[in-house]
Amino acid sequence: NITVGRGIEVGHIFYFGTKYSNPLGAKISNKEGKTEDLHMGSYGIGVSRLVGAIIEAHHDEKGIAWPFQVAPFKINIIASDELLKDDNISKLYSFLIQKYKDVILDDRGITFGKKIKDSELIGIPWTIIAGKNYIESGKFELVNRLTNNNEKKSLEDLEKFDFEKNFS
């Protein structure tokens, strides 16, 4: 059975044979020590096409939903303006940047809601929110971009949490 579907070329292989090696006189020695013409090929992966294919396969009505392993940023911390200078926010950001490298602390001067929408749109796998809940209970909201699951976690919980293992 043949299934017909749409696809995108993300890589290619071209076999040139001896088309280029013969004019150059390029030869190799085989296992028996005999000289043979060199056979050539070209192999490539289109990185920009690969990114497009990943986005095509991993998006929803909110925007991109990057797989954790290839996400340009793994975690986005969103804090209300009055909490941006909070010691726990700084500690959390420092810890996460050392462990995961690709972490954003969104300190743009735009509304809280816009920051959350932007995080969803660009597909950051995890968003940590420090807002009203943090002020009331000292717990952050941890939101999974794929499932939209929202959990309350303390700073200590987040430092122990394995963001890569728990992303699905």
Predicted regions, residues:
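NTP/phosphate- and nucleic-acid-binding module
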Residues: 1-168
